A protein has these predicted regions:
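Catalytic phosphate/metal-binding cores of nucleic-acid and nucleotide-processing enzymes, i.e., regions
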Residues: 234
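Conserved, non-catalytic sequence blocks in retroelement Pol enzymes and Pol-derived host proteins
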Residues: 227-231
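Charge-patterned, long linear interaction tracts outside catalytic cores
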Residues: 253-267
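P-loop NTPase motor core of the ASCE superfamily
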Residues: 237-239, 246-255
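Secondary-structure boundary/capping micro-motif
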Residues: 1-209, 219-226, 240, 247, ...
Length: 267
């Protein structure tokens, strides 16, 4: 398409200063997808309205670049998320404490995402350094809790989970099968006897909510980055960004809004 014809296509919207500024802020700073931007603007009934197709055209044509990227930074189009292979591989068996409840025994309310308080648990580690992130994601709201621990062992993970959930009343926890969750019985006793339900080995889709959220975290904390020097305040900031990002599966509400049952002005 000739550039003049392309500019005629986007001029009514992305060449509007207010619309351009809003789209650029939400896409570049908060990493919202074009769909999230478009449908959240509609959800909040903003006077600024733009289709996600128009935003995609602007991205792929480099219209949102405007020379704002620092040397070595990825181009805007490469910020669009693409799914890769899961990190779990067959042939590796972990040792852990006795598994008392299988995921097939998990209450139907948890399976159907009918209530707040059913959590999925995992860790996010790097290939360098011993530190890792312990992540908890509420199944209904997709609300994320995240805390860094000095090393990926059962004691550190136990302490982090208890710390993150001590002020709530979790109903169930579905963790990864790794040995770092071997102290699940101790966690259960500390959290009002919350029940753990373990998935099948090497089937991360049984904890798909957490796996997807960990993928979003990887955008901020790549696998090659040593987490040891990452400040807790930065982790909290990135978790807040994800918790305030609208989701299609939540009818364009954010996890924060669903978890706390409130409405926010995010745009």
């Amino acid at each position: 398409m000739p550039i003049t014809a392309y500019l005629q296509l986007i001029k009514p919207l992305l060449l509007n200063a207010n619309i351009y500024k809003t789209v650029q802020l939400l896409f570049l700073q908060y990493q919202w997808s074009p769909e999230q931007i478009s449908f959240r603007l509609k959800h909040e009934k903003k006077p600024i309205q733009i289709s996600y197709a128009t935003i995609y055209r602007g991205i792929y044509r480099g219209f949102l670049e405007e020379g704002k990227l620092s040397p070595g930074q990825r181009g805007v189009a490469r910020k669009l998320r693409h799914r890769g292979e899961t990190r779990h591989k067959n042939g590796c068996i972990e040792t852990r404490g006795k598994i008392s409840h299988h995921i097939s025994e998990r209450p139907e309310q948890a399976n159907q995402r009918e209530r707040i308080g059913d959590w999925e648990a995992d860790t996010v580690a790097s290939v360098t350094g011993k530190a890792c992130l312990v992540t908890l994601v509420d199944r209904k709201s997709r609300y994320l809790l995240c805390e860094k621990v000095a090393k990926k062992d059962s004691i550190s993970v136990k302490q982090a989970i208890i710390h993150m959930l001590k002020d709530s009343r979790p109903k169930t926890i579905t963790p990864d099968r790794g040995k770092e969750f071997s102290r699940h019985e101790e966690i259960s006793k500390a959290l009002n006897d919350v029940q753990f339900y373990f998935p099948e080995p090497h089937q991360p889709w049984q904890r798909g909510t957490n796996e997807n959220t960990n993928g979003l975290l990887r955008e901020y904390f790549p696998k090659k980055q040593d987490l040891t020097e990452i400040k807790p305040s930065l982790i909290r900031d990135k978790a807040l960004i994800l918790n305030q990002r609208p989701r299609k599966c939540l009818n364009w509400k954010s996890p924060f809004e669903v978890y706390f049952n409130i409405s926010l002005h995010l745009t």
